[in-house]
Amino acid sequence: MKKVKILNLEFDNLSKAEFLENLESGVVFTPNVDHLIKLEKDPEFLQAYSISDYNLCDSKILIYASKFLGTPIKEKISGSDIFPAFYNYHKKNEEIKIFLLGAGKGVAFTAQNKINKKIGRNMVIATYSPPFGFEHDEKECQNIIDMINNSGATVLVVGVGAPKQEKWIYKYKDSLPFIKIFMALGATIDFEADNVKRAPKWMSEVGLEWLFRLLSEPQRLWKRYLVDDVFFFLLLFKQKIKLFIKKDRKGDSRIWEIADRL
């Protein structure tokens, strides 16, 4: 499987169709620009990514970045797109039984009903919307593990936001022996329940989904998009310089010294 490296993370260079054909088991993460910035600063988040079997590019900005680096990623595969594609792909596969963990009270249950109605069978067999701060409550986490293990689910979709969802999967994956596929999918459960409005398709296609989200939740997201994520472009430029210098092996050794410091 071909990989594309952007900053300190390798992405799987797959189309949506290739991913669905290949996925039989494993951990699926959908990194975006915000993930890459957090990975630079958060060792526990980076450690959580070490168990990921599939890193799917969930950002048009990262698609542009991969082209800038000379290693284009085939396709943007967001969590909110891949999940409906996944359950439709396995529509007749009785072995796929999904547990939804995340979203606000009652939202996951609404998503369950909507998905099962679309599919025509009870593919989503159980849900749970955990309380705020659940990840710090070991007793609550153990209750969640028991719920999942007793549900009969083979697929776990966790939608509690990054880096919380990835860290939770990393910590408790081995306590969930019946789960074959783990997916960390952010706001996907909210989207499936029609609880949160998605960006217009044209905005997603040109890389402006972040702007739609910022305008929808300015108080929560302004710092992420207007302060934290701006750092990404500096890091990307540094990576490009390194690649350029590596190609020019006849250059001045002083340039190599500069590259090593970047």
Protein language model features and the residues they cover:
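N-terminal nucleotide/polyanion-binding subdomain common to many enzyme families
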Residues: 1-83
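Conserved beta-alpha
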Residues: 67-152
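Proline-aspartate-enriched helix->loop->beta-strand connector
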Residues: 148-157, 161-162
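Short, flexible loop segments at boundaries between secondary-structure elements
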Residues: 130-135, 178-216
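A short helix->loop->beta-strand "cap" motif at the edges of active sites that frequently abuts
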Residues: 25, 94-96, 177-181
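Short Gly/Thr/Asp-enriched flexible loops that form oxyanion-binding sites at enzyme active sites
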Residues: 111-112, 166-175
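A transmembrane-helix-recognition feature enriched in membrane-embedded lipid enzymes
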Residues: 61-66, 198-255
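Short gly/pro/ser/thr-enriched loop/turn and capping motifs at secondary-structure boundaries
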Residues: 62-64, 164, 188-193
